[in-house]
Curated annotation (Swiss-Prot):
Active site: 42 (proton acceptor), 149 (proton donor)
Assigned protein family: Belongs to the pancreatic ribonuclease family.
Name recorded for this polypeptide: Ribonuclease K6
Major localization class: secreted
Residues of the site described as Critical for catalytic activity: 65
Length: 154
């Protein structure tokens, strides 16, 4: 009976450990709104090497994010996409919006290292993007809707 219970406990601990390691990937860091976290993760007006740009993201989460996309645009222009017609997001919600024209962006993919020395491969692209938008929170800029999630690039 003892080893049987130990096996169940080990499995539970393994599952909890896996959940804990994945959970922070999408969690908004304390003290930030969803829109501000979106801006930190995905807005980079000027071209910047992924290794440097990702350090700003990874410092909030204390781990190497596996992949991330930076839109080379200003927050105001990305927010304007929230006024485009609604489309269905990957999660089935109806609060997504597609950019009316393609933009320069950089896809960063983790290749090696350990936080804080994360190393990334840069992939420059010119594509449309789809963002999820929600009403702003109290401390967000005063727009009707603000981007809170980069759903995909197309």
């Amino acid at each position: 009976m003892g080893p049987h219970l130990l096996g169940r406990s080990s499995l539970l601990l393994l599952l909890l450990g896996m959940w804990w390691s994945v959970r922070p990937l999408c969690a908004v860091p304390k003290g930030l709104t969803k829109a501000r976290w979106f801006e930190i993760q995905h807005i980079q007006p000027r071209l910047l090497q992924c290794n440097k740009a990702m350090s700003g993201v990874n410092n909030y989460t204390q781990h190497c994010k596996p992949e991330n996309t930076f839109l080379h645009n200003v927050f105001q222009d990305v927010t304007a996409v929230c006024d485009m017609p609604n489309i269905i997001c990957k999660n089935g919600r109806h609060n997504c919006h597609q950019s009316p024209k393609p933009v320069n962006l950089t896809q960063c993919n983790f290749i090696a290292g350990r936080y804080p020395d994360c190393r990334y491969h840069d992939d420059a692209q010119y594509k449309f993007f789809i963002v999820a938008c929600d009403p702003p929170q109290k401390t967000d800029p005063p727009y009707h809707l603000v981007p809170v999630h980069l759903d995909k690039v197309v």
